[in-house]
């Protein structure tokens, strides 16, 4: 299987003082997911949130389900987020990290390697993206930031040098975006 789990469990409780929920699962290859959330009455009709979410995926084989163009994906995905604020104005603080990403794209004749991405959320209003990816003798760097609101602007910058974008019999494409 591309993604297996064991010991999956959820638990919830409704009380006058608080509503709580938990999720836990051991994933294949030593991965796991764990989350806790608690809602307590706040001022007026507000519900105050307090919780966290942790994720560790030590196998990225599931990526092959998302695209038939990507084969042999590798690397590790981890996340650690704190949940706070209120139900009407939640705050999410934390980071999602992709480390050691590698994959092949046979149609383009390339092997991606040493990929690294960090997505940091600040106050559920803003996120910052940073990453890099190697192919051939070159590297791409990505950086960006944006907001989570529907009308929030998002900026992404891609820079690089000598990144092998395609290596097929008809063409060898090396890019250096700035």
Regions found by a protein language model. Give the residues of each.
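Interface amphipathic segments
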Residues: 1-178
């Amino acid at each position: 299987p591309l993604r297996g789990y064991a010991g999956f469990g959820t638990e919830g409780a409704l009380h006058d003082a608080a509503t709580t929920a938990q999720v836990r699962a051991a994933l294949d290859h030593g991965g796991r997911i764990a989350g806790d959330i608690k809602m307590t009455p706040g001022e007026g009709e507000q519900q105050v949130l307090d919780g966290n979410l942790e994720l560790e995926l030590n196998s990225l084989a599931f990526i092959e389900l998302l695209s038939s163009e990507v084969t042999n994906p590798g690397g590790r995905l981890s996340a650690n987020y704190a949940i706070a604020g209120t139900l009407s104005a939640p705050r999410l603080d934390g980071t999602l990290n992709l480390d050691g990403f590698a994959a092949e794209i046979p149609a383009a004749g390339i092997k991606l390697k040493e990929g690294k991405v960090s997505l940091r959320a600040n106050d559920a209003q803003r996120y910052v993206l940073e990453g890099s990816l190697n192919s051939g003798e070159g590297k791409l760097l990505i950086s960006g930031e944006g907001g989570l609101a529907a009308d929030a602007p998002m900026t992404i910058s891609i820079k690089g040098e000598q990144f092998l974008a395609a290596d097929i019999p008809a063409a060898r494409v090396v890019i250096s975006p700035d």
